[in-house]
Amino acid sequence: MTEKEIYDLYNQTTPRPEYFTKWEKLPPFPGQKETGGWNKNRQWDGHDFPRTWCILDFIEWTKDISGEHLGFTCQEDPELEFIAAKYNRHTFIPYPPYDLHEMPTLDDPFDFFIFNQTLEHLYDPYLAVANISKNVKAGGYVFTSVPTINIPHMTPVHFGGFTPMGLAVLFHRTDFDVVNLGQWGNNKYIEQMFRTQSWPDYNALKDSEGRVTNEPKNCCQCWVLAKKRGYK
């Protein structure tokens, strides 16, 4: 990419100032029914806080998206609850046995593919996303979230993180257009995470009015919705 292309991508995808306050005070947990896993108790408490913004963005960004074939790498991803019903066929691609570094080209490509909290555990993220790209239809979507800064976990299979711009460039270079780019982080979260070697939740971060700030220069996690090129 040329320097101009990098700056153009930055200007097209970087969240605007108003983005950083839109979920400062969290709404009630979305949905009605109790489900398993992350969404079991319909509460924001007890979970790594950046995922709350990620879920809210995901719901907003995908509200008008539907299709035929949904693929995903984790059955516990909370985002699945808010999109699975809009797809007729679902394909689970777990690791093991499947490795995104060696993902073959499938006969039945995806209209939407989700692989959250995975890129930091891939030794060659570009290869993995290029393989995913080969398995997404033109005009299909991919969504992923990834830490920018994090405590060591799943060592030694933990290789790094991504800035929002790094995430945008990764997808731009693998035949995707970046539709939306989100991020969250603040200094309080960073300090608590490294001091306790754990992931702070909503209760640990909220102020007396229930607010949690999102500081643009203290990004801790980011996420992207990207669309495969070749659509009209």
Region locations from a protein language model:
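Short, surface-exposed alpha-helical recognition segments that flank or form part
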Residues: 46, 120, 214
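Conserved N-terminal segment of class I S-adenosyl-L-methionine
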Residues: 1-112, 126, 219-222, 229-232
